[in-house]
Amino acid sequence: REKNYSKAQEYYEKVLTINPNFVPAANNLAYIYAEHGGNIDVALNLAQKAREKLPEDANIADTLGWIYYRKNVFGTAITYLKEAADKMPEQPVVRYHLGMAYYKNGNRDLARQELSKALAISTEFDGAGEARKALEDL
């Protein structure tokens, strides 16, 4: 099924205009910006605000980690993504995110471990192709 990210982005932006404190919309919009070419600094700001309101939320930790990954701040990315993976060990996208952060940070063994776990959980997730390519390179 095709995902309509521009429609989702528009929806989340409207929701935040009405209720700027609605954390799920802030988190999801931050992720869309990070993943689909939006302003990465705006994404980071949204995710940080979401984190302040729900500091224990694993989805927000994943979003923050992926934004730091996109900003090439791999050490910080790993911290958040490890937290997300510890809280949601069966989420292949989270394992993929953590594996890619390890990969870019030069942690080859941990990258291989996390990317393999992601693909063992599911072979179809956003980033599965990139995970397979990275594993071939390891």
Task: Annotate each PLM feature.
Residues 1-14, 36-49, 71-83, 106-117:
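Structural signature of tandem alpha-helical TPR/SEL1-like repeats
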Residues 31-32, 66, 100:
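Residue-level recognition of tetratricopeptide repeat
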Residues 28, 63, 97, 131-134:
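Canonical tetratricopeptide repeat
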Residues 52, 56-80, 84-86:
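Generic long, charged, amphipathic alpha-helical segments
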